[in-house]
């Protein structure tokens, strides 16, 4: 034996497999202000105790592996290991638990959402001892938040750039999302902006396809923006999707957008990846571009109640990585979103400090230490009859985005935009006068129809349209 081997043997190394809970379940641990805290919904395999399951999550997402290894003795596990410090049963489910895990800050690279997720939600989600695993929430410590630059500009700077205050911003996704030529696409952008919208938007899968290459789209949209601004006297924008197959190509598209003088670009941050998103956010900050974020592919990760990752975690990650807008669901439209849970992560996007509130799905108190806020974007299956509810639910600091609810107007795109702008202005005025939007919403819209034939036509088209399905994402 070499002296090194003898030394290891003398301190008690014993080959083999031991229970995770012996090392990683520490119910007496007092969490530190610098720890990253995670709340996991854990469903163990039959026969696996909750303590062992929670400890396995802590181990496999930090320093642990399936067997004892010699090199454990070459570092301080007590300094670097994750710890399952609390377990609580889920009401109504005999074999499901919320397991709380604390991770030392030294486990994570500064300013890297990619590294944070690689550790916390990496291989552990395929662990055989677990039937299902879902990351419900994270507490990001102040010390780690300050290593990120966050959103390129934030809510107040965006309002100052646009010179628009006291109401939600109004947008529209151009439809059909695929198949239009660049010139016809630009025409639709112009008509919507001229009609009164603040923004129009590329859909998430509009990149650079044979029917419309990105450079042509950027040119025609920039022309539409300039023409609409000249006619209305308002600052306008179109979310030019810079998402591409490589980071280099993505930045090239953002550079061209800046050269055209447009105010905002867009990125699909989940499909594009957090490394690409953070790079684009840094470029936008340095070059005066706003950054709109689409969450395409999020439901693959967050739709199932028992497995995956809740969107509130993805929302926090986006605020770290960088984005000025992000899609958040509508509560009232065609896409998933229960009211209290949606408003919970909307507050996490906008507010500087959010208290723990399990009734809204918030597991930890979170401080953002002056990191700029992100505007939530309500988009998907909404129309003029939804305007009072959207104004009441999301408030002024939001973007309300009507795609089919603008372009589906029987008189055309510009009248569709007029209808939405009139409905929004009517709701904001009624709210400012002290009227109850939740109770009087339909009356407010009908009153506005008397002096807006465009709104009256829109109300007639969509008076029967509802999306009444039960949300999957509910409080336990």
From Swiss-Prot:
It catalyses: 2 (2R)-3-phosphoglycerate + 2 H(+) = D-ribulose 1,5-bisphosphate + CO2 + H2O; D-ribulose 1,5-bisphosphate + O2 = 2-phosphoglycolate + (2R)-3-phosphoglycerate + 2 H(+). InterPro entries: RuBisCO (IPR033966), RuBisCo_large_chain_AS (IPR020878), RuBisCO_lsu_C (IPR000685), RuBisCO_lsu_C_sf (IPR036376), RuBisCO_lsu_fd_N (IPR017443), RuBisCO_lsu_N_sf (IPR036422), RuBisCO_lsuI (IPR020888). Substrate binds at residues 123, 173, 177, 295, 327, 379. The modification N6,N6,N6-trimethyllysine is found at residue 14. The disulfide bond which can form in the large chain dimeric partners within the hexadecamer appears to be associated with oxidative stress and protein turnover. GO terms for cellular component: chloroplast. It comes from the Eukaryota. Its cofactor is Mg(2+). PROSITE patterns: RUBISCO_LARGE. Gene3D superfamilies: Ribulose bisphosphate carboxylase, large subunit, C-terminal domain, RuBisCO large subunit, N-terminal domain. Its EC number is 4.1.1.39. Mg(2+) binds at residues 201, 203-204. SUPFAM superfamilies: RuBisCo, C-terminal domain, RuBisCO, large subunit, small (N-terminal) domain. Pfam families: RuBisCO_large (PF00016), RuBisCO_large_N (PF02788). The record marks 334 as: Transition state stabilizer. One of its GO terms (molecular function) is monooxygenase activity. Keywords: Acetylation, Calvin cycle, Carbon dioxide fixation, Chloroplast, Disulfide bond, Lyase, Magnesium, Metal-binding, Methylation, Monooxygenase, Oxidoreductase, Photorespiration, Photosynthesis, Plastid. Heterohexadecamer of 8 large chains and 8 small chains; disulfide-linked. The disulfide link is formed within the large subunit homodimers. RuBisCO catalyzes two reactions: the carboxylation of D-ribulose 1,5-bisphosphate, the primary event in carbon dioxide fixation, as well as the oxidative fragmentation of the pentose substrate in the photorespiration process. Both reactions occur simultaneously and in competition at the same active site. The basic functional RuBisCO is composed of a large chain homodimer in a 'head-to-tail' conformation. In form I RuBisCO this homodimer is arranged in a barrel-like tetramer with the small subunits forming a tetrameric 'cap' on each end of the 'barrel'. Belongs to the RuBisCO large chain family. Type I subfamily. This is Ribulose bisphosphate carboxylase large chain.
């Amino acid at each position: 034996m070499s002296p090194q081997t003898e030394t290891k043997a003398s301190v008690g190394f014993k080959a083999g497999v031991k229970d995770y809970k012996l090392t990683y379940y520490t119910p007496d641990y007092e969490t530190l202000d610098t720890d990253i805290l995670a709340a996991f919904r854990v469903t163990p395999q039959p026969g696996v105790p909750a303590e062992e399951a929670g400890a396995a999550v802590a181990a496999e997402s930090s320093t642990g592996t399936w067997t004892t290894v010699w090199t454990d003795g070459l570092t301080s596990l007590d300094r670097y290991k994750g710890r399952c410090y609390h377990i609580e049963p889920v009401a109504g489910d005999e074999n499901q638990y919320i397991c709380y895990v604390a991770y030392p800050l030294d486990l994570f690279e500064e300013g890297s959402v990619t590294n944070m997720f690689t550790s916390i939600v990496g291989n552990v989600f395929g662990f055989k001892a677990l039937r299902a695993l879902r990351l419900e929430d994270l507490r990001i410590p102040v010390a780690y938040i300050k290593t990120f630059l966050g959103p390129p500009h934030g809510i107040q700077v965006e309002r100052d750039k646009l010179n628009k205050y006291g109401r939600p911003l109004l947008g529209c996704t151009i439809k059909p999302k695929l198949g239009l030529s660049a010139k016809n696409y630009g025409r639709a952008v112009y008509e919507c902006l001229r009609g009164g919208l603040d923004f129009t938007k590329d859909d998430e899968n509009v990149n650079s396809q044979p029917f419309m290459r990105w450079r042509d789209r950027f040119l025609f949209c920039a022309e539409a923006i300039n023409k609409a601004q000249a006619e209305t006297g308002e600052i306008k924008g179109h979310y030019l999707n810079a998402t591409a197959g490589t980071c280099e190509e993505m930045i090239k598209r953002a550079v061209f957008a800046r050269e055209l003088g447009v105010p905002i670009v867009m990125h699909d941050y989940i499909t594009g990846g957090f490394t690409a998103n953070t790079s684009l956010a840094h470029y936008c900050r340095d070059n005066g571009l706003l950054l709109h974020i689409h969450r395409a592919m999020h439901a693959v990760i967050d739709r199932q109640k028992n497995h995956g990752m809740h969107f509130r975690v993805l929302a926090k990650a986006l605020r770290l990585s960088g984005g000025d807008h992000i899609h958040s669901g509508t509560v009232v439209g065609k896409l998933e979103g229960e009211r209290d849970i949606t408003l919970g992560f909307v507050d996490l996007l906008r507010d500087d400090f959010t208290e723990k509130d399990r009734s809204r799905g918030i597991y930890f108190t979170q401080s953002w230490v002056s990191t700029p806020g992100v505007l939530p974007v309500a988009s998907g299956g909404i129309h003029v009859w939804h305007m009072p509810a959207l104004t009441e639910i999301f408030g002024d600091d939001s973007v309300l985005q009507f795609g089919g609810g603008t372009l589906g107007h029987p008189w055309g795109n510009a009248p569709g935009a007029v209808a939405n702008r009139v409905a929004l202005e009517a709701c904001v005025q009624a709210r400012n006068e002290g009227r109850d939007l939740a109770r009087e919403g339909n009356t407010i819209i009908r009153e506005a129809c008397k002096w807006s034939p465009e709104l009256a036509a829109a109300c007639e088209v969509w008076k029967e349209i509802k999306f009444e399905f039960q949300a999957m994402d509910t409080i336990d």
